[in-house]
Amino acid sequence: MRGLEAPGAVGPTGPSGAPGSQGPDGDVGGMGPEGPKGDDGPVGPKGPQGAAIF
C-alpha cells in the first residue's frame, strides 16, 4: 500500500477587492445670520394748523 503524499504548497494571495461605495451626502448647513436692519420710513405728514389768536 502506497503512503499518503505530502499536501501541496499554499496558493498565491487572491486579488484585492473592489473599492467601497461612496458615503452619503453631508447634512445641509445651518441658516445664515440675520440680515441688516431696513431703512427708516419717510417723514410723516405735516400736522394741522393751530387756531388763530385774535
Curated annotation (Swiss-Prot):
Q: Give the Collagen-like domain ranges.
A: 7-51
The protein here is known as Putative collagen-like domain-containing protein 065L
Enumerate composition-biased segments (Low complexity): 42-54
User: Matching InterPro entries, A to Z?
Assistant: Collagen (IPR008160)
The highest taxon in the source lineage is Viruses
Compositional bias (Gly residues) spans? 26-35
- The segments labelled Disordered in the record are 1-54
